[in-house]
């Protein structure tokens, strides 16, 4: 696939107040040409579009299109020295309120925070979960292609996050959030089933037997995340690590480890992320799409269970000139059903890109 991107630069990373990008002026400053004195309201517009040409190797056909990758409105500010807020809304997603949190999927952020002092703060509302990895925290306007696993992470949830800045370079967080934005039946459909992970095949009649269970809603479908963002050697080495335990359904859980490391030099930036997720219920549905129709073609609403996803993602950025940079990105991902001999490695994907 080839793409010619056009972007309107704005801040907008997924962490905190989204101020990871530098030299970004607010809409007020761009329009009035005056320096903004107040911190109460900063308005940003994030917009990215591209012309894409794609070849489908299965059909041997080329297709082209103009594609609106992202369009969102963002407002950030400090109302007092202690109270801050962030609002981010995508104009390319549904505005219908979800059944669990009553927020629309279009709303990424509607967060209010209280800063107790230089060390402690608390945030609440809808926000991006405090997950590790550097790919997760990138402004989507500047991402040519996400990894499959990252592309399946729905991170904007109603949450409460406690943040502790031990030093200016070491931050720790503890967060409780909803696992879903909708009810279980809205996420997986009526009478959904999940495999227990046990799949047996008979060599005599060439049949496959799949052990399944009916999904039941959990009383407390919540996620618990512990995170660490660190900087060393004046910010030249950075980390974004997290561990998450999610309640997916009754007696169905997910464990997620995300470890991001980044080398951040003056003209060279390079990160390596490792992600591992072990799901009792295939929340990302990647393995389910590959295996369920083969394992149990008679089932109409079945999801894989005991699924493990692993991924390595790396990205290199080299600043060639003030307005020019070279980027190269690679990823390697696997999905497996750990308790099935037949599907211990069900999907494997690797990809590279440079631009």
Predicted feature locations:
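Predominantly the C-terminal beta-signal and adjacent terminal strand-loop region
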Residues: 326-355
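Aromatic- and glycine-enriched pocket-lining scaffold segments that form the walls
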Residues: 146-242
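Detector for outer-membrane/organellar transmembrane beta-barrel domains
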Residues: 22, 36-40, 83, 219-336
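Outer-membrane beta-barrel architecture
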Residues: 29-30, 72-74, 111-113, 161-163, ...
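N-terminal periplasmic/intermembrane-space "pro-region" immediately following the signal or transit peptide
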Residues: 2-48
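Outer-membrane beta-barrel translocator domains and adjoining extracellular loop/strand segments
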Residues: 54-61, 66, 95-106, 135-141, ...
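Outer membrane beta-barrel
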Residues: 32-54, 60-182, 230-231
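Residues that define the transmembrane beta-barrel architecture of outer-membrane proteins
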Residues: 62-69, 103-108, 154-158, 218-224, ...
């Amino acid at each position: 696939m080839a793409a010619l991107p056009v972007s309107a630069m704005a801040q907008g990373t997924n962490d905190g107040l989204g101020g990871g990008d530098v030299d970004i002026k607010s809409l007020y400053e761009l329009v009035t040409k005056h320096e903004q004195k107040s911190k109460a309201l900063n308005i940003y517009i994030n917009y990215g579009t591209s012309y894409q040409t794609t070849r489908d190797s299965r059909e041997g056909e080329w297709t082209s299109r103009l594609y609106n990758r992202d369009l969102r409105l963002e407002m950030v500010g400090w109302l007092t020295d202690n109270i801050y807020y962030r609002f981010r809304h995508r104009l390319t997603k549904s505005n219908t309120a979800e059944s669990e949190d009553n927020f629309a999927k279009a709303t990424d952020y509607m967060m209010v925070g209280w800063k107790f002092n230089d060390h402690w703060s608390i945030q609440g509302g809808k926000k991006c979960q405090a997950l590790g990895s550097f790919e997760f925290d990138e402004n989507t306007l500047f991402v040519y292609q996400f990894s499959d696993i990252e592309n399946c992470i729905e991170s904007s949830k109603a949450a409460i996050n406690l943040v502790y800045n031990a030093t200016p370079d070491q931050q720790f967080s503890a967060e409780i959030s909803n696992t879903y934005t909708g009810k279980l039946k809205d996420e997986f459909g009526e009478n959904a089933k999940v495999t227990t992970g046990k799949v047996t095949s008979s060599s005599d009649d060439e049949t496959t037997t799949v052990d399944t269970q009916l999904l039941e809603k959990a009383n407390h479908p919540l996620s618990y995340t512990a995170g660490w963002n660190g900087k060393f050697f004046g910010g030249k080495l950075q980390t974004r690590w997290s561990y998450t335990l999610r309640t997916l359904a009754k007696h169905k859980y997910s464990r997620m480890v995300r470890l991001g490391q980044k080398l951040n030099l003056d003209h060279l930036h390079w990160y390596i992320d490792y992600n591992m997720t072990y799901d009792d219920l295939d929340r990302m549905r990647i393995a389910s799409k590959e295996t369920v129709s083969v394992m149990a073609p008679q089932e109409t609403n079945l999801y894989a269970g005991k699924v493990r996803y692993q991924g390595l993602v790396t990205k290199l950025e080299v600043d060639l000139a003030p307005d020019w940079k070279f980027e190269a990105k690679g990823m390697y991902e696997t999905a497996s059903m750990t308790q099935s001999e037949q599907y211990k490695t069900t999907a494997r994907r690797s990809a590279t890109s440079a631009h």
